[in-house]
Design a protein with these regions (language model features):
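Glycan-processing catalytic domains of CAZymes
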Residues: 2-341
């Protein structure tokens, strides 16, 4: 793919795929399924309790379980997704808390490269903010990706560069000098305000994305602005990727986060509304946040009730809903997006 202009890409759908999960049965320990009980605590919610609003239909699982990865890839391909953006916390860590877990991410990436190929999916990377992230750690992450993955044919590339989405990198001192070190990586950055776009272009970003699952929180995540953003990006020869989410609910994980950040699924209507605006923006790509982020409650992966965790219109759907509600809905929405001329 050449040229970053929004009009010069085929229509593609990407999804963020959480890779930090481990289980005692598969890996000898848990990661990804636990969360701090409050913002300053080192006391964690751990299985069998799960800090999410529902639980996976297949139960808690490991990102190293090939059977699970095949099940996911088959489902993701079936609904029309083209690219998996693997969450990447560094080669030797597994999750946000920067837990030392040597080689964990590498195993997941290598398994996904093999399995995604079987299902005709491509791989990119989403690098979120994590504890103690700084210039040095991000430099190490990017060097590792550049040296070990950028030339692999299974990776999704734009202008022969591996796609990298970065969530909070602009807050890191001297980050532009880091971008310019890697000529085999295509950087798309999260932004909040209209004034960010020009500055990010000067910094070396070749694209922008909205990322946030909570609509209206910033100028960029206000869906009524997406047509304008798409126009601004096109004028600067930058790629714009609007981000859609089915909802956002951290009431059982980030319990200290303000209620104003929560977004009800409204029985699927919130998701429909975001997709409608994404399609109308005429961007060639849409990002789903997420396939399986259970901690943030943004998952479309099939979910079931368990104990006190029940379906309702805020966290999933009404009493007539089933576990595949958002898989079915996503397939229909992707079809509408790809058919629009």
């Amino acid at each position: 793919m050449n040229d970053n202009n929004n009009s010069n890409f085929p229509k593609l759908v990407l999804t963020i795929y959480s890779t930090s999960f481990s289980t005692k049965e598969n890996d000898g320990h848990y990661s990804g399924w636990g969360y701090r009980k409050n913002s300053v605590s080192f006391d964690y919610i751990q299985p069998p309790d799960v800090p999410s609003v529902l639980v996976p239909k297949i139960g808690i699982y490991s990102s190293h379980n090939e059977t699970v990865l095949r099940y996911h890839c088959a489902m993701i391909k079936e609904i029309g997704v083209d690219v998996l953006l693997l969450e990447y916390y560094g080669s030797n860590h597994s999750d946000y808390f920067n837990m030392e877990n040597e080689g964990f991410s590498d195993v997941t990436v290598k398994l996904m490269m093999k399995i995604s190929k079987e299902y005709g999916l491509k791989i990119g990377f989403f690098i979120p903010y994590y504890n103690f992230q700084n210039y040095k750690t991000l430099d190490e992450d990017l060097q590792y990706i550049s040296q070990n993955y950028a030339n692999n044919p299974q990776m999704f590339k734009i202008n022969n560069k591996l796609l990298i989405l970065l969530s909070e990198s602009r807050d890191i001192n001297h980050f532009p000098s880091l971008i310019k070190k890697f000529n085999n990586l295509f950087f798309v950055g999260y932004f909040r305000y209209s004034t960010d776009v020009g500055a990010m272009m000067e910094d070396g970003y070749e694209g922008i994305f909205t990322y946030e699952p909570y609509e209206g929180n910033f100028w960029s995540s206000t869906i009524d602005n997406w047509k304008i953003i798409s126009k601004i990006a096109k004028e600067r020869n930058m790629l714009f990727i609007p981000t859609v989410a089915p909802g956002y609910n951290t009431s059982n994980s980030h319990r200290w986060i303000s209620e104003r950040m929560q977004r009800s699924r409204d029985n699927g209507n919130y998701y429909n509304k975001m997709w409608k605006s994404a399609i109308e923006s005429n961007s060639p790509m849409v990002l789903i946040n997420s396939f399986n982020n259970w901690i943030q409650g943004t998952m479309i992966e099939p979910a079931i009730e368990q104990g006190k965790l029940k379906y309702n219109v805020n966290v999933w759907g009404d009493k007539n809903s089933n576990s595949f509600k958002y898989i079915i809905q996503t397939k229909d929405l992707i079809k509408s997006f790809k058919q629009k001329t």
